[in-house]
Amino acid sequence: MNLNQLFCERIQYYRNDPKRIQHFTKVHSYAKLIGEREQLSPEELYILEAAAYTHDIGIKPAEEKYGSSAGKLQEQEGPAVARGMLMRLGFAKDVIERVCYLIGHHHTYTGIEGRDYQILVEADFLVNLYEDGRPDGDGGFMPDKAAVETAYQRIFATETGKWICRSMFALGGVS
């Protein structure tokens, strides 16, 4: 299955919602970069990329059912929607199962199992730490420095993810 078909399907799913499209596109970009630099196998990278494109697929049904996009609701609602989409697009059963597992856990930060899971969480954090910041007056955002430092200490485990976080948010010891 071609990941670009999934990318296009996700754009269509969130048509008229550029914020959501921008978000999953950025998460995918960081996930792919980290995955490649951390030398994931082609199979692991493929699953990671599919999960990065679909990780927030549960937002739409969560908002429709509960009026909320809370992380736990995304984890609850996302796998079923993703499973249907991935099956329709012809993804292999083992890929679908792992992607759905990752979607169903991507806001759970304890007991992270697997490099794909760790990297997906790091990529999502890189984007969310910026997007959840306060407006900076120039059309961008000013991230909460304490939140960045806490996430760096508690969440980031890969060398590449740590390096991107330090570089992006000007944490001490950037190298």
Map each language-model feature to its residues.
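Active-site metal-coordination segments of metallo-dependent hydrolases
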Residues: 15-26, 64-77
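Divalent metal-dependent phosphate-bond-processing catalytic cores, especially two-metal-ion Mg2+/Mn2+ enzymes
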Residues: 2, 13-41, 54, 91, ...
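Active-site-proximal substrate-binding core of FAD-dependent oxidoreductases
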Residues: 93-100, 112
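An active-site-proximal "capping" alpha-helix that borders the catalytic cofactor pocket
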Residues: 27-30, 72-88
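Short alpha-helical hairpin
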Residues: 1-9, 52-58
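Short helix-capping and hinge/turn segments at secondary-structure transitions, especially at repeat
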Residues: 36, 59-63, 83-91, 108
